[in-house]
Amino acid sequence: SAPELPEGLIVNGRVDRLVVTEEEVLIIDFKTDQPAPDSPDGVAETYRAQMAAYWAVLQRAYPGRTVRTALCWTDGPRLMFLPEEMLLEALKGAQSAV
C-alpha cells in the first residue's frame, strides 16, 4: 500500500521528468546546483524530503505499479536512485515537522 503522507502536509512541486510504463513509474528530478554526492547517503535532506513527497503522491496516483525515484546530477551527468527505505525515513521526518 502507498505510504501515508503526514496530515497537514501540503505538497507543492513539479516533477522534472516522469516516465510511466505498464509496470513502473520513474520520477526524475534534475539537480544543477551542486556536484553529485558519492552515494544516496550524501543527498541533502531537503532533496530526500522532496522526492519522498513525490513518491508518496505518485504511488497513490498509480496503484499497482512500482514507483522509483532518481536524481539526475547534471555535473556528471549521473543518475542516482534513492532507496525506498530512505524515502520512508524522509516521510517520517516530515511527519515530525508538521
Task: List where the protein language model places each region.
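Structural signature of nuclease core domains in nucleic-acid processing machines
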Residues: 1-98
